[in-house]
Amino acid sequence: MIPTKEQAWDLLCEYNEGEFHRLHARIVGDVMRYFAVQLGYADEADFWQTVGILHDLDFEQYPDQHCTKEAEILREKGVDERLIHAVVSHGYLLTVDVQPEHQMEKVLYATDELTGLI
């Protein structure tokens, strides 16, 4: 199952109460949508946005298990492995050894860091 951006937002809010984390998720989702269109993946813009929204799903409640706990949560919810790989890969070399492979995953890796500075 691939959640819609609305379902992704609701799921994010289940695990994140802080305004900063919610705002960060929204910004990363919007930036991911922008780059999907710019890089020729307009037909996947919703998916890219959903990945951006969910990328830090576990961070507020499980900072010491960031990315690994998220994979558990998403698998329990029946989320598609492609989405799980994408969100987990943004923690490459920090918390996990899942390497970003697809262009979308590489964009997420960079976008997460850059939007965190804003």
Q: Over which residues does each language-model region extend?
A:
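Divalent metal-dependent catalytic cores for phosphoryl transfer on phosphate-bearing substrates
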Residues: Y41-I118
